[in-house]
Regions:
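N-terminal "arm"/small-domain region of PLP-dependent enzymes with the aminotransferase-like
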Residues: 1-56, 147
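Short acidic capping loops at alpha-helix termini that bridge into adjacent secondary structure
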Residues: 25-26, 76-80, 101, 180, ...
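PLP-dependent aminotransferase class I/II
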Residues: 39-40, 61, 210-288, 293-295
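Phosphate-binding glycine-rich loop
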Residues: 55-101
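Conserved PLP-anchoring active-site segment centered on the Schiff-base-forming lysine
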Residues: 96-115
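Active-site phosphate-binding strand-loop segment of PLP-dependent enzymes
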Residues: 124, 130-193
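PLP-dependent enzyme catalytic core of the Aspartate aminotransferase-like
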Residues: 167, 320-321, 330-365
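Conserved PLP-binding catalytic core of the aspartate aminotransferase-like
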Residues: 276, 289-322, 343
Length: 365
């Protein structure tokens, strides 16, 4: 399997705008999994208020942000390392660990592989199959840990949407501890679940020093342009990361946005409810289309398998309608038959379904 190319994610709306001549605001982006409610009022106000502070260096300790993370997620500040997006921390982590071999449950988020290869690691895949609903077999995954330095789990997994139960994750983490491996559990989409507290691995941090939890704040709080994330790990790991990263890696506006976002309980509850309702309608609408098989979903995106056309062909057809979808051809263990769609608001989802229906008619986009 060839490693991922230099940039093959969804959400590259500016490149598409340059290619098509459309303004980014004219495009409906279903390729990026961002909260459809958009920026909260609290975040907008916090960023405006913080503008005058950008004449100063940002707080290198990110003290207020760490306090907000601590309150929101019930963890000690000593476990928290803040980052310029979760991706930055992923790369720093791989650079300081210098793994010789990593194990991925594929298909999954491509930056795990890219960060590992950038640090010189060999990458092995544990295949997740459509026949098994893309569910992880924790015992079989644990049996592959010999000689592995870092194992990555995404929960819920991007792009499949499958959830890993905490007990299943602990099976892997415990086996990895015996094998001398770190386990990075990416919980960037977990906040979209109403029962997220039942599935997070945060309660396992005290028992397993080899557990590292990665979390982006940009997806749930709709701030990908600001870049904000954090990592939870044993303080010894955090100290190593702090010495390796840029001391001012989280800018003033991102810190202010994070504090405001994490304290906004009303926005969080509204987001979970809105995404759950819209996702149910979207999955039903997709299932009614000819040649589309959506897989069960629990976060703010849906994986679907196509029959009668391919993802690259459909992507181009949808682009002519001003709609971006995620062609999953470049995911290891997926084929050109797969697409991923974000969950948006009902009127946007209706526009998506109408365009899909038109372009899938007679299987000839």
């Amino acid at each position: 399997m060839n490693p991922p190319g230099p940039f093959e994610h969804g959400g590259n709306i500016h490149a598409v705008a340059r290619l098509t001549g459309a303004a980014p605001g004219q495009l409906l982006d279903y390729s990026a999994n961002i909260n459809p409610l958009g920026l909260s009022v609290a975040v907008r106000d916090a960023v405006r208020t913080a503008l005058d502070d950008i004449i100063h260096y940002p707080d290198a300790a990110a003290a207020a942000l760490k306090s907000a993370i601590s309150r929101r997620y019930g963890v000690q500040p000593a476990l928290i390392t803040c980052g310029n997006g979760a991706a930055e921390l992923l790369y720093v982590l791989c650079q300081v660990r210098r793994p010789r071999r990593v194990l991925l449950a594929a298909p999954t988020f491509s930056e795990y592989e890219r960060a590992a290869r950038a640090a010189g690691a060999a990458v092995s895949y544990f295949p997740l199959t459509a026949e098994d609903g893309f569910r992880l077999d924790p015992d079989a995954f644990a049996a592959r840990l010999a000689g592995v330095d870092i194992a990555f789990l995404c929960n819920p997994n991007n792009p499949t949407g499958c959830l890993i139960r905490r007990g299943e994750a602990e099976t892997v983490i415990a086996a990895a501890a015996r094998a001398g491996a770190w386990v990075v559990v990416d919980e960037s989409f977990l906040d979209f679940l109403p029962d997220a507290a039942d599935h997070t691995c945060r309660p396992l941090l005290a028992a397993y020093s080899n557990l590292i939890i990665l979390q982006s704040l940009t997806k749930f709080y709709a701030i990908p342009g600001l870049r904000l994330g954090f990592l939870l790990a044993d303080p010894a790991v955090g100290d190593i990361l702090d010495r390796a990263k840029d001391p001012w890696n989280v800018n003033t506006l991102a810190q202010a946005a994070g504090v405001a976002a994490l304290g906004d309980d009303a926005y969080r509850a509204a987001s979970v409810a809105a995404v759950a309702a819209a996702r149910e309608e979207l999955v039903s609408g997709l299932a009614a289309l000819p040649g589309v098989h959506p897989f069960p979903a629990c976060a703010n995106f849906v994986l679907a398998r196509l029959a009668g056309t391919t993802a690259p062909v459909l992507r181009q057809a949808m682009l002519r309608d001003g709609i971006l979808i995620r062609d999953c051809s470049n995911y290891p263990e997926l084929s050109p038959a797969y697409i991923r769609l974000a969950v948006k608001l009902p009127d946007q989802n209706a526009a998506l379904l109408a365009a899909l229906g038109k372009n899938l008619k007679d299987g000839n986009p």
